[in-house]
């Protein structure tokens, strides 16, 4: 069975993971974290009184991992459906991993809001995609449905958050589970 890496570009934990790991031996699977929460009844800690502590913990992990400081987008967390649909467009063009890595750098190393079209455009350009074509494709009903279907399939497999690495029946969730600190 192929190893699968489930992700959403709005997650700083995904940023921590892809910034330090090659992940070139896995199938990248874009899903909607918000969609997972809707299915499971969960929600983001970033919208609770744990926000500041959670952000500080992520910043400390980035420093511990030797990564550049996190630059939080002003509107984080936001609505990343457009960015996640753009991931599906990138997959159709064979540049999903490159697009996702660029989007995550734009969001968490440059502090740009991935819920805004211009940030997605920059990720598309850096990945060799035509941003106008990407913008047109992300509005397609079949692409919207595909993201819903991929998210449902991930949920059915037991995925409850991102990042998650599925290796056969084994699910590793979180940057620290996928590559435990030594």
Question: Residue spans of the language-model regions?
Answer:
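C-terminal cap of thioredoxin/glutaredoxin-like
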Residues: 3-24, 105-182
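Structural alpha/beta surface segment adjacent to cysteine/selenocysteine redox centers
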Residues: 9-107
